[in-house]
Amino acid sequence: MTDFAATGQLLGTVVAVQANFYRVQLDQKQGEIGEMGDRDSHLPYPPLLLCTRRTRLKKIGQQVMVGDRVVVEEPDWAGGRGAIADVLPRHSELDRPAIANVNQILLVFAVADPPLEPYQLSRFLIKAESTSLDVLLCLNKSDLISELEQQKVSDRLLGWGYEPIFISVKDGINTDQAGKYLSNKITVIAGPSGVGKSSLINTLIDSAKLRVGEVSGKLARGRHTTRHIELFELPNGGLLADTPGFNQPDMDCVPEELIYYFPEARKRLAVASCRFSDCLHRDEPECVVRGDWERYEHYLEFLDAAIAHQTQLHQQADPESSMKLKSKSKGKGQSQYEPKLESKKYRRISRKTQLQDLQELYRDEE
């Protein structure tokens, strides 16, 4: 194991990336005042250094992501600068959002204002499950519904395979309980706009001071107030990543794998097997998944979307394909794919082009 301290190098975590600069938070055990020599007293503790990437890393194509564990050398304590010399191996990597070494996803929804929408929640849960990370579900604005209503929602989600934590950022209900699940982990917070994600981060981390958007009355969605990915240090250890808001996650998973993103379906497959190994659980005989579970209709809709997405990718990869697909809104936050004709092939020929063709024809006859 490399002794980074002996070589004058430091270990840290990339907490933000902007342009070609990387903000690196050094490990506390390597950030003791006695080891930092002429460290400027105005630097935070543990110190944050604004770093560049070594040319060697650029040449070998080594990208640096938020969440990366990195080796920093030649620290300039007075200027708060440094250089990233190496990137340690990642144990997980997300592409959207682009973040490394995540341990879990904190999914935040509101139970009221806007009301909880099962289809939208299910879509976010599927996307979270597809990362193979642990999923923690928090339901905000619980002060707006009764305890009886909370119990009904809880029972329903337990049937889905999730035990929600009811919180109220406004009234400070159970926010400390939610914070305990985040200690000593890198957590990505996600969910639709307007449900209180930024407010929750502001509650958990006073230094975050994120801009908070109100819910838009027209679409019952909040304004997208988060512009870039950033990790915030939690008081009890751990880092929390706020990600740029998105309304509907893409259903870009492999159709054959989709069923495993439903915990209630995984339970069925754990005790029995379908007759066919490539069963998609629609109308195949002797299927052990198809049945009277609540989200089965969600599964069928998501399966259609996943198949359409996969078909679109195959057709885009085939330059000889004359049939493309385009996304068309169905309303209620849903979309479907339909054939798209190639404009060049089916576009009406202009009169100018027709005249030029006739002139060429006359010349050929002469």
What kind of region is each of these model predictions?
Residues 104-105, 118-166, 293-305, 309:
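Charged, amphipathic alpha-helical linker segments immediately N-terminal to NTP-binding catalytic cores
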Residues 111-112, 141-142, 169, 243-246:
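Conserved Walker B
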Residues 143-195:
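Canonical P-loop GTPase G-domain recognition
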Residues 1-117, 351-366:
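N-terminal accessory targeting/assembly segments
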Residues 3-8, 61-66, 74, 89-94, ...:
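Helix-rich effector regions associated with P-loop NTPase G domains
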Residues 115, 145-146, 173, 247-249:
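Catalytic P-loop NTPase motifs of RecA-like helicase/translocase cores
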Residues 198-213:
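A conserved segment at the C-terminal end of the G1
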